[in-house]
Amino acid sequence: MKVSSALFVAFLMLKKVREKPNVAKKMNTTDAKFDKIRSLFSGKRVLVAFSGGVDSTVLAHIAKQSAAESKLLTVDSITFPRTELQAAKDVAKELGIGLEVIQVDELSNKELVSNPVDRCYHCKKELASVWLNAAEELGMDFVVEGTNASDMEGHRPGAKALEEAGVFSPFRDAEITKDEIRAYARRAGLSVADRPSMACLSSRFPYGTEITEDRVRRIDKIEKDVRELFGVKCVRARFHGDLVRIEVGREERSKLFDESKLDELYDLCKKAGFKYVTFDIFGYRTGAMNEALES
């Protein structure tokens, strides 16, 4: 998919903000950063890679306001939680933007199944191909996705794949943080403003551990059950062979500090096929499976 010279210039302007921190500091307000994105979208037909989370929702909101035309594309796969797919459909209706859903078979990709340290690179590379092909078929000018400046901390091989493919990450390039995105969502009255971040289910497995359909479905069910039974918004079920490690949001840990609730947690994890169940007392933190790399 070819990018016009004018669009490329606009993209470079965004990159300059990222590459020169002193430029970003000179911006008077956060709104000036968002204005850069509005300028990028102006007069263009924009396809938003859409998950229904706060990042892609705010990006879609800006596209609807600023672009000549905007469409949403959700890629559905075994590693996309079932609850997230429905949420994406609901938020698309809230935004009033057309949503395309494309089904892909991630587990047919051996590089993803083997779960190497650079798994996210291979995953994003495949996703980028799907997005760009869809954009061409739909007659859109370019594809954008919601990686933000806060996401760039730590191990992020997926960002490299997106940049190589020519998928734009406007929030990252304008140095817009997660907090700034949430603040925008609140001002805009978007329902997802305080929605916890969600990563694909592949992130629940230690690098080098094979990712299978059965394992993914077990993890997905546990997380769904924990949310429903205990009213927890943020939960991760980390796979460690016969053992599953449960993380919940740090401010939500007390919701499970009860003997009967811990028994319920144990029972539902046993039913999912695990011999051992642990509750991570520190709670959820992003990139937990990358901690092994740091050690």
What are these regions (language model features)?
Residues 2, 15-22, 26:
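Polybasic, lysine-rich low-complexity intrinsically disordered segments
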Residues 8-11:
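Aromatic (phenylalanine/tyrosine) cluster motif
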Residues 24-187, 244, 260, 264-274, ...:
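ATP-dependent adenylation/nucleotidyltransferase module used to activate substrates
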Residues 172-178, 182-227, 233-234:
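Mid-to-C-terminal catalytic subdomains of enzymes
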Residues 232-237, 276-278:
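A short linear hydrophobic-aromatic micro-motif
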Residues 239-250:
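Short, aliphatic-rich beta-strand segments
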Residues 253-261:
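Short, conserved charged micro-motifs
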Residues 287-295:
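Short, low-order "capping/linker" segments at domain edges
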